[in-house]
């Protein structure tokens, strides 16, 4: 299987603190993996089952980053503000995760089928850490480590030191999702379906770079077939 990946990031606003103003452009890169599957069916009862696996796919994106921030001196004698600036090309390694899909369908009565889809994606451990971004985080952490252990500086020191080894994007849990529903053919021209879905999320906090943390959904579909060779859904 062939996959393309690219990205553009611009961090703006007070929520990003010292990293606001960071920009990155990651050029398109293509990668290949492999796909394998099994399928089984019993036409008499409209039973269909399939199981597919997709491997990890590795990418190395040519990147250009703009880091322009200042590590403050916090008014401490001998601790001067430090300018972090970089506008440099580099490489960003990204590995998209392996996944498994299970699809089931079976007739439950005349002109009616039940269906189920279960999907697993191994997002646990996924991370994107562009070179200059990572170096900026580590320098901010170093500035935090250099702060004296004063009670008034404890929150700032803890915040800065927590940035060491950080990533632009990271997930720490496997993702599970499932959809179950029923479809029915009402007559020769009309059919419909209803479904309910659930997604566990990947353990990431909700941010502008990871806007959801799991969800439920409800779906309703209608299909109209004016002629045997085409339909409108």
Predicted regions and their residues:
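Outer-membrane beta-barrel porins/channels
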Residues: 1-233
